[in-house]
């Protein structure tokens, strides 16, 4: 299992040169272990019929969100005075809230809701539960998502947005599973790359529970 964190040069690559061994957050062994787990006394949790173990701490999430915000500011906010952030409900609400506070510049925020998950599995079909009401025509759009897994939902969303003639669309996702991706799309800003395991917390749910957790947990098989 390997997880990558955002570096200043590339949003999808971890730079080992940025810190010495004691400061590294990620291990390069088979199992990913956030170092702060040992300090925060994070414990396993139980949600309905599943057990989840600690994966990424709230402190590590906060640092990654700041780095994503800096990249968006440099790439978009410095060049476009009126970008539109489209927040995908329900999962991205915590990531979007922290990300937009870090950006701290005037911008328009709108919300959409699509669904392709039942329990721990993607259904392969996408339902539009709440459409976008903001004007997209000729504008820079930044989609804020909790996770890009197979890409099924994101592919459907991009097709939906392109019909409204945006200037261009960028994707900012808290989590990205490159090994699971089935579509030709680019995640422009990803705080973390993770393997295919099912996770919960920080907005992500298992059967609508666990969104309120400040840390991220992975299913304990």
Where do the protein language model's features map onto the residues?
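Polybasic, lysine-rich low-complexity intrinsically disordered segments
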Residues: 3, 10, 21-25, 31
């Amino acid at each position: 299992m390997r997880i990558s964190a955002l570096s200043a040069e590339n949003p999808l690559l971890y730079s080992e040169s940025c810190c010495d061994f004691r400061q590294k957050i990620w291990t390069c062994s088979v199992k990913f272990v956030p170092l702060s787990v040992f300090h925060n006394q994070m414990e396993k949790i139980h949600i309905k019929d599943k057990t989840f173990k600690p994966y990424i701490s709230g402190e590590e999430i906060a640092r990654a969100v700041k780095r994503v915000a800096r990249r968006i500011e440099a790439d978009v906010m410095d060049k476009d005075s009126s970008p539109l952030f489209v927040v995908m409900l329900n999962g991205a609400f915590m990531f979007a809230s922290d990300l937009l506070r870090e950006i701290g510049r005037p911008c328009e925020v709108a919300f959409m809701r699509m669904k392709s998950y039942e329990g721990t599995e993607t259904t392969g079909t996408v339902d539009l539960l709440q459409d976008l009401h903001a004007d997209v025509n000729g504008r820079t759009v930044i989609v804020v998502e909790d996770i890009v897994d197979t890409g099924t939902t994101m592919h459907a969303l991009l097709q939906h947005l392109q019909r409204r003639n945006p200037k261009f669309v960028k994707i900012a996702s808290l989590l990205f599973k490159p090994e699971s991706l089935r579509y030709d799309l680019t995640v422009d800003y990803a705080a973390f790359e993770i393997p295919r395991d099912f996770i919960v917390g920080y907005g992500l749910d298992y059967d609508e529970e666990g969104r309120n957790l400040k840390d991220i947990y992975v299913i304990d098989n």
